[in-house]
Amino acid sequence: MSRIDRNDVYKLQPTLVTALTNLGDAAGQVIEAPLVHLLHLRISQLNGCAFCQHMHAAEARRDGEQQQRLDVLAAWQETGFFSARERAALRWAEALTLLPSQQLSDTVYNELITQFSQQEIVNLSAIIVTMNAWNRIALGFQFQSSLMAD
């Protein structure tokens, strides 16, 4: 039996795709699009999902993100390219994505609450959970982008 491909995943369980898409879209209405792009890309980097990295970097560029910031996103803590709000969100994304290998510290949460409302924190968390789910689906079924298939 051959591996289930991306289109088959969508056909075999459309409710899953719809649920993940709806959750991500709803949370993304509360959080600004440039930050959502950064989170999607950073989480995909952490999870090693080339398909998602390729897709979300292209989306970010299409929506006006600077290539310079995308180039250093994996080392965001070492640069001055990201705002305090972006840094807090990226740190939160890393903490939630890397569970259980690292504990959530009060420092990370305290930084987060200085930059985001409670509603925004819940929505950030939903974005992070959703992207992690997509990464695991894409990695599990070895999704390939058209550029990577060559």
Language model feature labels by segment:
Residues M1-D150:
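Hydrophobic alpha-helical segments
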